Amino acid sequence: MQGVVIKKLEKHKDERGWLAEIYRSDEFDFKPTMSYVSSTKNGVVRGPHEHKFQSDCFVFVGPGNFELHLWDNRENGETKGEYLKIEVGENNPTMVIVPPGVVHGYKCVSEADACCINLPDKLYKGEGKKEEADEIRWEKDSNSPFKIV
């Protein structure tokens, strides 16, 4: 899908546990401005939604696993209408950069709660949280063509 970056993350393991690089400024032309982490319970869906201006940099390393769903909803994109579903998380550590106009959402598919880290390139609600959120919340539209079941 045009503009979507999917990078398999390598867990370097030893007797102490593991370490994985999740973002390097010398690998991608992407500059995070904030970060957050979320935990999602088994069977719970987050999204789908999209952004007009913001790109997300999702990091799925566990615990837990997700089905990540992506739909290209960009009017003039060369991959408009394309759909992609991948399993990410503890079993498939992955970093995914999602550009504006790509509808995205994920569902926890593990028994245990699953964690996701996001490093978006725009501040949520802008400087000092004084702006409208850059979100088209497809999950609130019962007629949405974008469904995660």
Predicted feature residues:
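Short beta-strand His + acidic residue motifs that chelate non-heme Fe in jelly-roll/DSBH
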Residues: 96, 104-109
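Non-catalytic, conserved peripheral segments adjacent to functional cores
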Residues: 1-91, 109-149
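Short, exposed beta-strand "edge-strand" segments with a Pro/Gly-rich flavor and a Y/T-containing core
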Residues: 90-98
